[in-house]
């Protein structure tokens, strides 16, 4: 079975409970659409668990990007802390130079997206989804080529893409060539939705149901793509 999750944010306990709930095994695959770190207290044990399991695939989110830039000396402690990175930074600052270098290599190698096909359905898995300034339309179909559009956005400014919320505000006339699955923006805050449930839009699915917004009713979601079954912890 193939599963997707997103925005776990250092909550290893809820993540592990989810794996138990879905009976995750070595025969399954799990794609995590970014933001495994920050805002929670179990950031590095979550990262290590994902790193060591070959059937769990992490896609880069804006918080992995901040982590990477901090290790490179580009993002300051103050900036990272302001974005929720304090607990992660405290863990990281105690690591050896070699361990930091290993983590940096891992973060730099994370993909921005993955394409998968299940039962003749094509899905484009990514963290934020879309940047309105980069829209490449296939002249034959009139559809936005999402992979080429994201490639262009990332080549121009990876940070702007990973932090973008544009997919939630696009005009109705815009159609994509693949079904997009995203995290990044909690469904609790989607206009005219505001629920801690997976959101199914006409053009995209949002699986960030606000795990680090539990004071607002948020929770961790997991979607099984083979049959559309939803799980929550």
Please provide the spans of the model-predicted regions.
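Conserved beta-sheet core of the metallophosphoesterase superfamily
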Residues: 162, 166-232
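Active-site environment of divalent metal-dependent phosphoester hydrolases
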Residues: 9-13, 38-41, 65-68, 132, ...
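His/acidic metal-ligating clusters that form di-metal
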Residues: 99-126, 131, 135-189
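Active-site-proximal beta-strand elements of phosphoester/diester hydrolases
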Residues: 1-9, 123-129, 205-207
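Short, conserved active-site loop motifs that form the nucleotide-linked donor/cofactor pocket
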Residues: 28, 55-56, 123, 204
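Active-site neighborhood of divalent metal-dependent phosphoester bond hydrolases
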Residues: 43-116, 120-121, 141, 145-146, ...
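Divalent metal-coordination and catalytic microenvironments
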Residues: 7, 35, 50, 61-62, ...
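N-terminal active-site segment of His-dependent metallophosphoesterases
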Residues: 1-49, 53
